Amino acid sequence: MIIPGRLRALVVDDNAYARAISAASLKKLGVGDVVQADAGAAAILALMTEPFDVMLMDWYMPDVSGAGLMQVLRDPRFGAAQATPVILMTAYASRDNVVRARELGVNEVLVKPFTTDQLGIALGRILGQAAQAAADQSIFL
């Protein structure tokens, strides 16, 4: 699956290698702009200053966890970034973690290590949801 080059993605992981692999996979899928953040706090700052079409994030990070980041992101006071689709990347995909992530508004869950094809499928589902939501809203304009 090829993603249009104008998409912007934010990759958040405290592990530099995991960030680099995820960013490379997004580029391979055709994502035009990939920004990397090494911590949850850095991701919050990035989301406050520029729009992203999707965010990939780790669940366990030392400063602000994935759960904490989702609580901030999905808060209505956070503004337009609140609607940013999120793919959780985790090596700890226990039932409790996945349920909690979904409750907090995570759109897709990928278990590390994942393939570029698996990431492409998750992106396709997210982009399909976004397109459907936009179509649904246009009916009421």
Predicted regions and their residues:
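Two-component/phosphorelay signaling modules centered on CheY-like receiver
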Residues: 16-35
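Acidic, metal-coordinating helix/loop segments flanking the phosphotransfer/catalytic sites
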Residues: 36-54
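Acidic catalytic/metal-coordinating carboxylates
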Residues: 39, 65-73
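Receiver (REC) domain active-site loop signature in two-component systems and cognate sites
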Residues: 61
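Alpha4 helix (beta4-alpha4-beta5 surface) of REC/receiver domains from two-component response regulators
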Residues: 68, 93-108
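C-terminal output helix
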Residues: 114-123
